[in-house]
């Protein structure tokens, strides 16, 4: 921006942020984050001269954090144009959004935005100032992808919008109807221009596979979540550090000695359980999958049901990606001052809608007492709900550390390059793909450089013996790390 007036006009017309004056603070934190994101910066340096994303117009729907700012600026350094919104109403870091806006990138993200604003912002990232169109999506949770597909269906028959099952669906469906009244082909026009999507998280990946199985997916997708250097690092090690940070910021509770229940023992649940045990909580795990349950038991965790644990534990963490894992009845049974939070993507893991009928008392932003009235001879009680059942580590904390996000976002950039450079070929017909293992290993090598790690090099004989090249890949695709 040439002048303050230019910047203010850009922010007023092409952004929705909390406070542009926070941009200097955001820029300083971005500079620190870059020193902790070796993989992402190495990819920026390697590919900047080639401009492999030239011509790409990327709509991004992903938590607008300091680490995401480094991702955005990497995409732009490689030639892309970018517009961004957060994928969660509580996860934005306002100084990060301000710094990105000050750099001339349209961004629509405010911490604590309403659901109406959320879906308005998700629409706006598909609208370009020159009237052009998005041709790539970078998604987290699948909302940007869902919006275009659902809207295009509604163009043919709005009956698909008639029966919302939640407050969020009610607001989303109303937003789609409003847009269709303004432009009856808004969604299909944009949908047909998109060449591909890269999806960040487990929940969004589930949506993609479901859409593909039903024949509804209209463009190819790369499942970034299941790259080893994403799921086994971001999901596990990231949650291991960010969960308890968020709980303690929100409540100042002493974790040691308390009984903590982790619902789900996938990678996110594993990291969450490790974090709570490291602070000397007694950790119980709930699971539906006997393999994951056996893993938990072999790690020394007690495997129980929520029905059993509800009135006994002190801290509850949902980490499943599933629906109503913690129900109204579970919360009704809980102890006074029990803490309930979610580290899965959507708020419906906890039946927040089922307890909205009770009195809510805000303690501070994203920390609420829900007051259950006296009943059946039991006195009034309060439970603590964090981030209104949405992602606790970003609602009540600052999310995962920069270093682990470098792995995830390096995969995102590589996936965007991979899809964009395949446009016009038959390399990626409509479907859901994962990145090849040699790219996974590349990300790991880049990340290792700052950890004083020195890799052993196979001899020719050793490589021949196990049937690999000296340069890798070192494992078969079916290998489970």
UniProtKB/Swiss-Prot annotation:
Protein's cellular compartments: Cytoplasm
Pathway stated in the Swiss-Prot or TrEMBL entry: Amino-acid biosynthesis; L-homocysteine biosynthesis; L-homocysteine from S-adenosyl-L-homocysteine: step 1/1
Details of cofactor binding: Binds 1 NAD(+) per subunit.
SMART domains, per database record: AdoHcyase, AdoHcyase_NAD
Residues annotated as binding NAD(+): 201-203, 235, 264-269, 287, 322, 343-345, 393
EC category name: hydrolase
Keywords carried by this UniProt record: Cytoplasm, Hydrolase, NAD, One-carbon metabolism
Principal location listed in the UniProt entry: cytoplasm
The keyword Ubl conjugation is assigned to this record: no
Binding positions (substrate): 65, 140, 200, 230, 234
GO CC annotation terms, alphabetical: cytosol
Gene Ontology BP, a term: L-homocysteine biosynthetic process
EC number: 3.13.2.1
Annotated Gene3D superfamilies: Adenosylhomocysteinase-like, NAD(P)-binding Rossmann-like Domain
The reaction(s) this protein catalyses: S-adenosyl-L-homocysteine + H2O = L-homocysteine + adenosine
A single GO molecular function term of this UniProt record: adenosylhomocysteinase activity
Cofactor: NAD(+)
Domain of life: Bacteria
PANTHER family: ADENOSYLHOMOCYSTEINASE (PTHR23420:SF0)
HAMAP family tied to this protein: AdoHcyase
Cited function: May play a key role in the regulation of the intracellular concentration of adenosylhomocysteine.
Family, as annotated: Belongs to the adenosylhomocysteinase family.
UniProt-recorded name of the protein: Adenosylhomocysteinase
Species in which this protein is naturally found: Polynucleobacter asymbioticus (strain DSM 18221 / CIP 109841 / QLW-P1DMWA-1)
Encoding gene per record: ahcY
């Amino acid at each position: 921006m040439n002048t303050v007036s230019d910047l203010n006009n850009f922010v007023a017309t092409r952004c929705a942020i909390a406070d542009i004056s926070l941009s200097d603070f955001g820029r300083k934190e971005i500079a620190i984050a870059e020193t902790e994101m070796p993989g992402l910066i190495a990819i920026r340096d390697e590919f900047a001269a080639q401009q492999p994303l030239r011509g790409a117009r990327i709509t991004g729907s992903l938590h607008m954090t300091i680490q995401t700012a480094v991702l955005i600026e990497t995409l732009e350094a490689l030639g892309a144009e970018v517009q961004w919104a957060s994928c969660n109403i509580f996860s934005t870091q306002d100084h990060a959004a301000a710094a990105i806006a000050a750099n001339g990138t349209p961004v629509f993200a405010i911490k604590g935005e309403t659901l109406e604003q959320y879906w308005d912002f998700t629409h706006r990232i598909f609208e370009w100032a020159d009237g052009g169109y998005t041709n790539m999506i970078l998604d987290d949770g699948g909302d940007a992808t869902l919006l275009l597909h659902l809207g295009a269906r509604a163009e043919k028959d709005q009956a698909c919008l008639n029966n919302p099952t939640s407050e969020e669906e009610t607001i989303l469906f109303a937003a789609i109807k409003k847009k269709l009244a303004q432009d009856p082909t808004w969604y299909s026009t944009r949908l047909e221009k998109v060449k591909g999507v890269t999806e960040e998280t487990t929940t969004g990946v589930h949506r993609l596979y479901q859409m593909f199985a039903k024949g509804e997916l209209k463009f190819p997708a790369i499942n970034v979540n299941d790259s080893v250097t994403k799921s086994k690092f971001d999901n596990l090690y990231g949650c291991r550090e960010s969960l308890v940070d968020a709980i303690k910021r929100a409540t100042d509770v002493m974790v040691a000695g308390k009984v903590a229940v982790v619902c789900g023992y996938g990678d996110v649940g594993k990291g969450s359980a490790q974090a709570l045990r490291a602070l000397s909580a007694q950790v119980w795990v709930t699971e539906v999958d006997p393999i994951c349950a056996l893993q938990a038991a072999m790690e020394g965790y007690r495997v129980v049901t929520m029905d059993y644990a509800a009135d006994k534990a002190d801290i509850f963490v949902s980490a499943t990606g599933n629906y109503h894992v913690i129900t109204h009845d579970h919360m009704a049974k809980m102890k006074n001052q029990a803490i309930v939070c979610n580290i899965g993507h959507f708020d419906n893991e906890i039946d927040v809608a089922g307890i909205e009928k009770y009195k809510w008392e805000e303690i501070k932003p994203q920390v609420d007492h829900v007051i259950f009235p006296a009943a059946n001879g039991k006195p009034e009680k309060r439970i603590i709900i964090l981030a209104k059942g949405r992602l606790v580590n970003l609602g009540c904390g600052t999310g995962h550390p920069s270093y682990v996000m470098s792995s995830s976002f390096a995969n995102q950039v590589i996936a965007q390059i991979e899809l964009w450079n395949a446009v016009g070929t038959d390399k990626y017909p409509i479907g859901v793909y994962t990145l090849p293992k040699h790219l996974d290993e590349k990300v790991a090598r880049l990340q290792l450089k700052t950890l004083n790690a020195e890799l052993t090099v196979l001899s020719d004989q050793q490589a021949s013996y196990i049937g690999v090249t000296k340069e890798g890949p070192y494992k078969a695709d079916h290998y489970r790390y």
